[in-house]
Design a protein with these regions (language model features):
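Conserved donor NDP-sugar-binding/catalytic core segment of glycosyltransferases
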Residues: 1-56, 120
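Beta-strand-rich binding-surface signature
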Residues: 16, 82-84, 100, 118
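Catalytic lobes of large eukaryotic enzymes
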Residues: 47, 51-67, 134, 141-148
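A recurrent flexible, glycine/aromatic-enriched loop bordering the glycosyltransferase active site
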Residues: 61-86
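Active-site rim elements
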Residues: 74-76, 96-101, 156-157
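Extended amphipathic secondary-structure runs
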Residues: 83-96, 175
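Donor nucleotide-sugar recognition loop
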Residues: 90-123, 127-130
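Active-site-adjacent helix/loop segment of glycosyltransferases
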Residues: 119-175
Length: 175
């Protein structure tokens, strides 16, 4: 990924590339014994697109989805995955993480701010990160942010944080 960033950034048109994708998945086989099954066979490029069933589902927020493409070459894109991106170190200074986003709105905000700072988004095959897409706490050994047990100890509940996040995204877009 680092060599690809270097190669892309040598092109004056794409001098500030971001490599991003929704990572391939993995399954927990046995958490106690640290046994996992990685989806390492899938080497397609996954572009990120808006989900047709979730366009503007909450004000200006639309959900995203990874879409497989039949290519082994990098693809120029427009959306990013906040949990999986590679870029030059200047990215964290020019597009700093905004802690006022809570789940919804984070990726769209980051993409808009990156675009306005001259960054270009690319999706590539074989991203070296895997993600647990399983929501079952029994299998994964973790609670998710919307779990009632997690939420009861918060001063501000997750649904209120989500509402504030979507309003922040709306304010960014309408500014």
């Amino acid at each position: 990924q680092l060599n690809l960033i270097k190669g892309l950034s040598d092109d004056a048109y794409f001098s500030k590339p971001i490599i991003t994708s929704y990572p391939r998945g993995f399954e927990v086989i046995n958490l106690e014994n640290e046994e996992f099954k990685l989806d390492s066979i899938d080497d397609l490029v996954y572009s990120i697109a808006y989900r047709k069933d979730s366009m503007f589902m909450r004000d200006l927020f639309s959900r995203q989805i990874g879409r497989p493409l039949k290519t082994d070459q990098p693809v120029h894109g427009y959306l990013l995955a906040a949990g999986c991106l590679f870029a030059d170190g200047c990215f964290v200074e020019e597009v700093p993480y905004d802690p006022n986003y809570y789940f919804y709105g984070e990726e769209i905000s980051m993409m808009l701010r990156a675009f306005t700072k001259g960054f270009s988004i690319f999706h590539t095959p074989n991203i070296p990160i895997f993600h647990l897409y399983n929501n079952d706490p029994e299998t994964s050994g973790r609670q998710l942010h919307w779990n009632p047990d997690e939420d009861k100890n918060r001063i501000t509940k997750w649904h209120e944080l989500e509402k504030q996040s979507i309003q922040r995204l709306t304010d960014l877009i309408e500014a």
